[in-house]
Regions:
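Active-site rim/loop-helix segments in enzyme catalytic domains that contact anionic ligands
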Residues: 1-138, 169, 269, 280-283, ...
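Metal-dependent de-N-acetylase/amidase catalytic core
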Residues: 1-11, 99, 108-304
């Protein structure tokens, strides 16, 4: 089978992060023949279980949630059409670190973190696992989190650190040649959510009386993963694939409920809210679409 000429690598912390963050973008590029590779850094062992019949899988009981989430992730990837998914270093090499909420509204490290938690991972060792993937897949574009991990989750921050460091190391010819031939990723993006889109969504929900999942957020108090529009550099219009994104999110059945805020936004605003995904460029040169301040293609400007 021929290697796709365009290749996209996404690095995420837990199963479901990919579907929430870039599910529509992934489906769009798969449909266009782009090679899409997802690397998930942990098994999601510490995720909050929202389905009562799976409660026994929690870390303080049977501790089998990772196996269930592995199945859910596989189902989500099937929905999106992604055939190349890997766990960083292999399944359960790194454990979900968990988190707790800070009074300021962002996530911070939990009081009791497992010794094998991703948050405690040796940075070079973890990066080497990803270097090997980068040198094998040879993506032109990589997507991961910003330096705050979107909202402060320790695993998101660590995924950012590992991804950015691995991208540097993978390009160095003399660095561990046993991990493959060097490869320099041309463009790196950090996923983001548009502030104007979020404000419009919350306003619409409040007016319809369905904003119960967004208490505490207003025009001046948006979730920390929301980015003001002037900081965004790319907007991928994947509205034609929004239904796939929603189906992929539903596949993560232990983590996302159909009566939660994600689906409230979808039910009220349709494909508009989840079919457009936004990014900030962290490496490379942005090439905005004609008549726009934003790129409409993550591969824009590349001679792939």
């Amino acid at each position: 089978m021929a290697t796709p000429s365009k290749r996209l690598l996404l690095v995420h912390a837990h199963p479901d992060d990919e579907s929430i963050g870039q599910g529509a973008t992934m489906a769009k590029y798969v449909a266009e023949g782009v090679g899409v590779t997802l690397v998930t850094c942990t098994g999601g062992e510490m995720g909050e279980i929202l389905v009562p019949e799976f409660a026994h899988m929690a870390a303080d009981q049977d501790d089998t949630l990772a196996e269930q989430r592995q199945v859910e992730l596989s189902n989500a990837m099937e929905v999106l059409g992604v055939t190349d998914h890997r766990y960083l270093g292999g399944f359960q090499t790194y454990r979900d670190s968990g988190m707790k909420w800070h009074a300021d509204g962002h996530a911070i490290a939990a009081d009791d973190v497992h010794e094998n938690a991703f948050w405690h991972a040796d940075l070079t060792e973890a990066a080497d696992h990803l270097v090997q993937v980068i040198r094998e897949v040879r993506p032109q574009v990589m997507v991961t989190y910003d330096e705050f991990g979107g909202y402060g989750h320790p695993d998101h921050i660590q995924a950012h650190r590992v991804a950015m460091y691995a991208a540097q190391l993978a390009a160095v010819p003399s660095y561990k040649p046993d991990l493959g031939q060097p490869h320099d990723i041309a463009k790196i993006y950090w996923g983001a959510m548009s502030a104007s889109k979020m404000r419009a969504g919350i306003k619409h929900l409040r007016e319809s009386g369905e904003a119960t999942g967004f208490e505490g957020f207003d025009e001046s108090s948006l979730p920390p993963f929301v980015v003001e529009d002037d900081a965004l550099t790319a907007r991928v219009d994947a509205r034609a694939h929004a239904e796939q994104k929603m189906a992929a999110m539903k596949a993560h059945a232990t983590q996302i409920t159909v009566d939660g805020p994600f689906f409230a936004l979808s039910n009220n605003l349709g494909n508009e809210i989840w079919g457009e995904e936004f990014f900030r460029i962290a490496k490379g040169v942005a090439c905005p679409a004609s008549g726009s301040d934003l790129e409409d293609d993550l591969f824009a400007g590349l001679d792939c």
